[in-house]
Amino acid sequence: MKKLITADDITAIVSVTDPQYAPDGTRAAYVKSQVNQEKDSYTSNIWIYETKTGGSVPWTHGEKRSTDPRWSPDGRTLAFISDREGDAAQLYIMSTEGGEARKLTDIPYGVSKPLWSPDGESILVTVSLGEGESIDDREKTEQDSYEPVEVQGLSYKRDGKGLTRGAYAQLVLVSVKSGEMKELTSHKADHGDPAFSPDGKWLVFSANLTETDDASKPHDVYIMSLESGDLKQVTPHRGSFGSSSFSPDGRYLALLGNEKEYKNATLSKAWLYDIEQGRLTCLTEMLDVHLADALIGDSLIGGAEQRPIWTKDSQGFYVIGTDQGSTGIYYISIEGLVYPIRLEKEYINSFSLSPDEQHFIASVTKPDRPSELYSIPLGQEEKQLTGANDKFVREHTISIPEEIQYATEDGVMVNGWLMRPAQMEGETTYPLILNIHGGPHMMYGHTYFHEFQVLAAKGYAVVYINPRGSHGYGQEFVNAVRGDYGGKDYDDVMQAVDEAIKRDPHIDPKRLGVTGGSYGGFMTNWIVGQTNRFKAAVTQRSISNWISFHGVSDIGYFFTDWQLEHDMFEDTEKLWDRSPLKYAANVETPLLILHGERDDRCPIEQAEQLFIALKKMGKETKLVRFPNASHNLSRTGHPRQRIKRLNYISSWFDQHL
């Protein structure tokens, strides 16, 4: 008999990510990651899939993390990043003929994101360096916990990292033969998305070089001469661009981004830069699809940055697109022809194109199965290549969600899913939980979601939708929430409850719960201040006061302007009107507040304000603080805390529903 899923089962789920074909196509490297329950951490190792035998073998071992496998141009060496010898991750290379991996760097600040030069003689890595720090340092100077920290820029802290202390991501070239290092960038800016030109003479990267520490400023793409260091700006200095790659013939640059016409609600588009003519063209102006991964899940560890992959003839490239609850692979020609190569009810988070260009190898997650590797031949059916989660799927009862769609009063179509309890007995009724995603510009979709499975196993139905503001349904839809927080988005999620009850007569309309995190936490707070329809609520990493959020969040100083469309100093009352804290006196729903103590995106003072207000008024509430947890607790937090979080949620609903 199959077992019901529990919170602890996150320790049994394996993540299979970042597939990379070898240049000859005979094998592919990928990363397998899993919770290390004993150490309350994560373990990642590099595996190799052999295309001839269909089998996989591990190439790294141990309880640390080895990630980012990248083949040398001749396919004889594999580079990767690992923290196997200490806390700081370093660059290693391994021969395909066997033997021990060779460590190439020993930088106390760690390195990331390896990228081979076309001649195979060097590897580019990213290193975060603060003021006074160097790639030549052999020891990391420990920060004096009593030393004052001077702050002069707006972006002085970052969720998951804390105080930045003037550290920026720099690009460093490492010699494969000698290990000698050369720092290629030194601007006071984070440099990302690097790529070499085919001849190895140029390097493209993205950065905010405005000389102001303000994350809201334009993020541009630059081409650097590796001989002289001269820079050429590619993009128009009025948007956010990155994820660039050179065409094989060296003439074009494919890149993704937008001109922020709708601020951070703008769809990511595909662009082509003609290097010979110095002309930048948007290839997908008429495509109403977000060309990036915006799908939310909680079972994938790691993942990969997916940049455009060119065809050998330099006539087009492949990218990921977010559409209607799925992520798929899109082909875009240099003439602007666009069509999906694969768009099924699944979550593709990373892929690699075979050298013969006949098929992809992709990391795919489905609603009833955590991630695996699949072969996706052009125009043919997919084939599952790994069985990392076979045992988990075989031994557990997994609830299959039903797709729902409904029209709102103003004629907007809203999409979502209804997941029923894992076990249903006769005519027994069961409670319903409304789950609201964060962002707000993200998307629920066709993926395995452990939190929902845990609740379904406990006897709850779960309804989760993509309200206005979500990605996946076009530019007008994703932009609709801006300036209307708690408006039509509130109507959308409340109607989702009505639709679920209408579809399933077993749902008890008197036993309703609501939960959500980040923007979903804001909506949970907003809902319990507007209606007493729900009998229990759990708000996570939430927002309660937009006025204070403006100054305490790492993105608050521009997020409130962009999203609420109210100026902090000119429209203070309007920000207060949209703050759930204003309506705390209306709350009658028992409210559990979950928050990470090191959340710099939605700082814990947001939870504290709400908790104190409710407690002072005699409302039923509880605050649970997670030490050292960032905004990403539910996805990448310490495993033990992730398990406790899920148990807190289900226990609160068990108690009140």
UniProtKB/Swiss-Prot annotation:
Superkingdom, taxonomy of origin: Bacteria
InterPro entries: 6-blade_b-propeller_TolB-like (IPR011042), AB_hydrolase_fold (IPR029058), PD40 (IPR011659), Peptidase_S9_cat (IPR001375)
Enzyme Commission identifier(s): 3.4.21.-
Keyword flag Protease: yes
Residues forming the catalytic site: 518 (charge relay system), 631 (charge relay system)
Entry's Gene Ontology molecular function annotations: serine-type endopeptidase activity
Keyword terms, alphabetized: Hydrolase, Protease, Serine protease
Keyword Protease: yes
One GO process term, biological-process aspect: proteolysis
Top EC class for this record: hydrolase
UniProt-listed SUPFAM superfamilies: alpha/beta-Hydrolases, DPP6 N-terminal domain-like
Pfam families, alphabetized: PD40 (PF07676), Peptidase_S9 (PF00326)
PANTHER family in the cross-refs: DIPEPTIDYL PEPTIDASE FAMILY MEMBER 6, SERINE PEPTIDASE S9 FAMILY MEMBER
Protein family membership: Belongs to the peptidase S9C family.
Name used for this protein in its record: Uncharacterized peptidase YuxL
Organism of provenance: Bacillus subtilis (strain 168)
